[in-house]
Amino acid sequence: MKHPVPHKTQSNTYNCGPTCLEMLLEFYGIPYDSEKIDALCETAPRHGTDNQKLVEAAEQLGAHVIVKENAQLTDIISLIESGHPVLVNYFNCKSGVGHFGVVKGIEDQALILADPKNGDDYPLTFDHFQQHWHNHTRTIHAWMMYVAR
């Protein structure tokens, strides 16, 4: 099962969060302006995007979002099965930093992400994802956000 989340590529090394928010908003047909999203998220080269700023930006742009920390893989699976792509914050082993991606599907014991850095249809096995479902400092665990409609 996979949802048609439009893929976008991040424009620099630190704006994966706003880029993922753009993907979600476009999926739901919510109008947005890329520059406004970057400004609302207060994204910066040194630290990227704060989870809460991402939530606030989504709400200011008209999306009703639900956030969960310390979530379970089953939460993501249930949301995907009910038609909701899920924005997640995870540790990207390829780049060694915290990263945002949009889970858009499930195939063969793997999550399929629309990932602004690693590409569209980027697979992460359930085991790998669960081991790395935290921010780069390990202060936020199993964080997810989705648009409630």
Feature names for model-found ranges:
Residues 18-22, 34, 38, 51, ...:
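Extracytoplasmic/secreted envelope proteins and their assembly/folding machinery
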